[in-house]
Amino acid sequence: MHPNPAFRAEDRTRHINFARDRAFGVLALSTDDAPLISHVPFLLSSDGSMVELHLVRSNPILRTLTAPRAGRIAVSGPDGYISPDWYGLADQVPTWNYVAVHLTGRIEKRPQAELRGLLDRQSAFYEERLLPKPAWTADKMSPDALDRMLRMIVPCRMYVDDIQGTWKLNQNKPDEAREAAAERVEGGLGVELGWLATLMRDA
């Protein structure tokens, strides 16, 4: 998380809504040898207290979960390079704007009996965004194929103790300079630059 308090929004609801909508992040656990990292889709509860996810059975993280372990999920949003020329101000330096939320807590394996319900909820969450396409459901799979797939993955849950977010959107610049940079960022370098420009204008 960025140390500048101008970028460290304390709006927990905003962090939760962003992470819930994004529903994809980087799960990290510490070990004696090296951090273990996995990119995971997930479901976050409406109050931000619980994350549900699944991991493929061969994932090294699962081998460490003989008991609940401390973990963190980093959820990234849009990001982009900001040229100092865009501000219309003297003596500026390049920077990179971005949005990120970190969910920290204890992660554990869950009983295999919970997996089908989790997968149904996850697929429903994502399929709803594809409307008016008819929703895919696991019922479209043959029982044998579904059973083979279910044996390959394991349900997990993280109980969230802390949520922190960085919304680095040039809030430390005058409104006119931030607006000017937002106008230019869409043609620049980064990811989801249209979204980033909108967030900068609203900062």
Question: Model-derived features: where do they sit?
Answer:
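Short, basic/aromatic recognition patches
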Residues: 2-26
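A generic local secondary-structure boundary/capping motif
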Residues: 16, 91-92, 145-148
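A short, structural micro-pattern
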Residues: 21, 36, 47, 67, ...
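Short beta-strand segments
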Residues: 21-57, 73
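Pocket-edge structural micro-motifs
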Residues: 29, 55, 75-77, 160-162, ...
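Beta-strand secondary-structure signal
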Residues: 52, 72, 102-104, 155-159
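Short, structured beta-strand-loop surface elements
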Residues: 57-121
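C-terminal edge-of-domain segments
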Residues: 108-203
